[in-house]
């Protein structure tokens, strides 16, 4: 089942709800109405300074814990 979840990747657009640089994580509100978790380890170096309202494109990864954002770029 774990392998099935990781194979389901969907590219989408959203807006940063919040990102805490000290805690190294935050959330994105997807245009599809689904929030996605984002962690510093999944961000390119130049995007670690995300701020609320930044529009981003990312790939949603469906995990047992919920949706995780990967391959994020600011648009």
Annotate the PLM regions.
Residues 61-75:
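OB-fold/S1-family single-stranded nucleic acid-binding modules
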Residues 34-41:
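A short macromolecule-binding patch
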Residues 22-28:
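Short aromatic-glycine-enriched beta-strand elements
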Residues 44-57:
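Short nucleic-acid-contacting surface segments enriched for D/E, G, S/T with interspersed K/R
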Residues 1-12:
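Short boundary/loop segments of OB/S1/cold-shock single-stranded nucleic-acid-binding domains
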